[in-house]
Amino acid sequence: MTAQQPLDEVTATVATDAGMLVLWDPQRFEAVVDYDTWEDELLEDEDIVRHIQAGSLVPLNAGGDGAFAVQIRSGTAAAPAALTERETAHQLVASQPYLFVSRGRALVGGIEDVSGDASDGVIEHPVPEGRYAVVVHLIDWQAEAGSQDAAGRPVPGALPDFVVLIDLAQPGQGAFRTAVNTFEAPNG
């Protein structure tokens, strides 16, 4: 079952066994129907970069397998998407903007889930047709007091691992990140 909520925001936990979460336009991947067709489109980093450059895929590169809480938030021209005060206080790093060209919706899941369909465990988020700038924020949710239960699991209301902000691309905005690694490596 997919999680679908109103246009502005959706939060869910998604998992990957391939070390990377991604946001993608399912219409661009309608030809992906099995492992062989997935492999033809996404096996190598150069394949992934091609889709990033085309605006059909944005990496949320977790750098490992696991389940991650992801919040997707869309803004408008009048009210751009932004982090909340809590998210800002616990933000570890933000990506440079990625291009996302929407044909009506975005899906988020493990890279192994990419196809034209929203499979179980994938977040579905409506995004009107158009060109968008997507910024991915990594949040240190565990640093917030009271965010974990006795077993170290997030409590209800805990911040997510990732906050993904989707805003209309500005006219003339041409510099978008195209790297598979979502965040710049720290200097030093």
Where on the chain are the PLM-derived regions?
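Short, well-ordered loop/turn elements at secondary-structure boundaries
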Residues: 53, 127-129
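Extended, solvent-exposed segments with strong compositional bias
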Residues: 85-120, 125-127
